[in-house]
């Protein structure tokens, strides 16, 4: 018997966040097939009347690929330079892939001082609503080329998992679908323990869950499970919902929206 998440059936405005691990192959090359499939699925959803926003990571990972560098540099300025180079190439790829399906896209680069300041936050919200009204799929990334995270001037979100949640809050999205390198939230690391069990639903971010989530992301990205729980907490505080699922099976986005029990569904009990 196929179980259904009935709350999801009524969603209209969707934010999809894709992580670096879903865009960059383990060998550092760009995962072109995943980007193409993402463009197809999101274009199809847009054609069916859904409002879709894409939050993407990957600028630094793509920058590494463009320059043929294997190891992510530690220096902030070097990382910012890579992000600047990679963002141009990343948007070029997205534009090409979405064009195959006659879908127009736009780019927004955000920093925390935009979303934290009321006037600029309202301007960003108005721009996004206008784009959605035109049938455009906005593609959002953090402006890594200028974002810093220092005591006296914090403009960095920390990771794009949090950015996905903040964008969802900004546009009052019905659902955030977070594409990662794992099928969902497990009770233990599934790459180590064969008996690891996936959580079908999570209704509260507890200290126990936070302790269970550990480790950073891949060598190309920064997002680990801890950041995903932090993103879910932001949504919980705003009465919003999220599904965490595997970015290697992008076509399952359609099934998620149809209410199929895929990944881990983060929502508060009604």
UniProtKB/Swiss-Prot annotation:
The keyword DNA-binding does not apply. Catalyzes the transfer of a phosphate group to glutamate to form L-glutamate 5-phosphate. ATP binds at residues 17, 180-181, 222-228. Keywords: Amino-acid biosynthesis, ATP-binding, Cytoplasm, Kinase, Nucleotide-binding, Proline biosynthesis, Transferase. Substrate binds at residues 57, 144, 160. This is Glutamate 5-kinase. The keyword Cytoplasm applies. Pathway: Amino-acid biosynthesis; L-proline biosynthesis; L-glutamate 5-semialdehyde from L-glutamate: step 1/2. The gene is proB. It comes from the Bacteria. Its EC number is 2.7.2.11. It catalyses: L-glutamate + ATP = L-glutamyl 5-phosphate + ADP. Belongs to the glutamate 5-kinase family.
